[in-house]
């Protein structure tokens, strides 16, 4: 479980790498089988009070990114599907005064999870990302993770389909590009606080060498199938 490992943010990477290195000694795989927002997650106000916005969605996406990239988690699960006035459900259930029954509404957290789970299929392999700066110099290891900026990870499904997930945690747009060994087109899907952008199909691109990622958004890029 990833409870109590997300603050301070600077601690997220090191504690997961330590876990990864320990498990490697014993040839044991990691499944992250349960997590939700807790009281110590102060960056988003702790667990109390349901939140439908990108605030919680981005916070959890950063958690997923670190668990997959640095802990090498082979599986990742959220705590519960439907909840009340707490940040532990993908859906919020409530009963309005005088209403005959409950109302259920979705959240950006639900769709942010889909930026990963809808495209990265069982058996997928995570791929290494190598970064270069504007002068084409290779940047230090783990450059694809900026906890308050861009966080990128890439995967190959068993059928050869490539998936790239990019989190932009920053309050401003960020631009980045990717070079991949494929001539296939890419489909782009985005979750953000912009109206209607809940795992929304944005369009196709022939290449992804220069893409602008909107503020506070999660974008998935997927190669099209033949």
PLM region descriptions:
Residues 6-10, 37-42, 83-88, 171-174, ...:
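Flexible loop/turn segments at secondary-structure boundaries
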Residues 202-226:
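C-terminal beta-strand-rich structural cap/linker in extracellular carbohydrate-active enzymes
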Residues 1-5, 33-37, 78-82, 167-170, ...:
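Active-site-proximal beta-strand/loop segments in catalytic clefts of secreted hydrolases
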Residues 180-197:
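Solvent-exposed beta-hairpin/edge-strand motifs
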Residues 29-142:
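Aromatic/acidic polysaccharide-binding cleft in carbohydrate-active enzymes
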């Amino acid at each position: 479980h990833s409870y109590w490992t997300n603050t301070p943010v600077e601690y997220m990477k090191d504690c997961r790498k330590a876990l990864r290195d320990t498990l490697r000694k014993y040839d044991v795989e990691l499944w992250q089988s349960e997590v939700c927002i807790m009281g110590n997650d102060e960056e988003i106000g702790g667990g109390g009070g349901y939140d439908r916005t990108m605030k919680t969605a981005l916070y959890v996406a950063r958690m997923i990114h670190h668990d997959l990239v640095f802990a090498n988690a082979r599986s990742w699960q959220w705590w519960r599907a439907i909840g009340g006035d707490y940040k532990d459900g993908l859906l919020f259930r409530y009963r309005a005064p005088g209403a005959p029954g409950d109302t259920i509404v979705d959240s950006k957290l639900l769709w942010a999870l889909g930026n990963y789970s809808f495209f990265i299929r069982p058996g997928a392999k995570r791929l290494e990302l190598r970064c270069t700066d504007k002068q084409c110099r290779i940047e230090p290891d783990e450059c694809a993770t900026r906890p308050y900026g861009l966080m990128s990870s890439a995967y190959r499904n068993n059928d050869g389909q490539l998936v790239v997930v990019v989190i932009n945690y920053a309050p401003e747009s960020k631009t980045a590009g990717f070079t991949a060994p494929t001539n296939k087109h890419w489909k782009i899907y985005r979750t953000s606080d912009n109206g209607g952008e809940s795992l929304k199909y944005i369009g196709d691109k022939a290449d992804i060498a220069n893409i602008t990622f909107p503020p506070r958004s999660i974008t998935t890029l997927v190669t099209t199938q033949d």
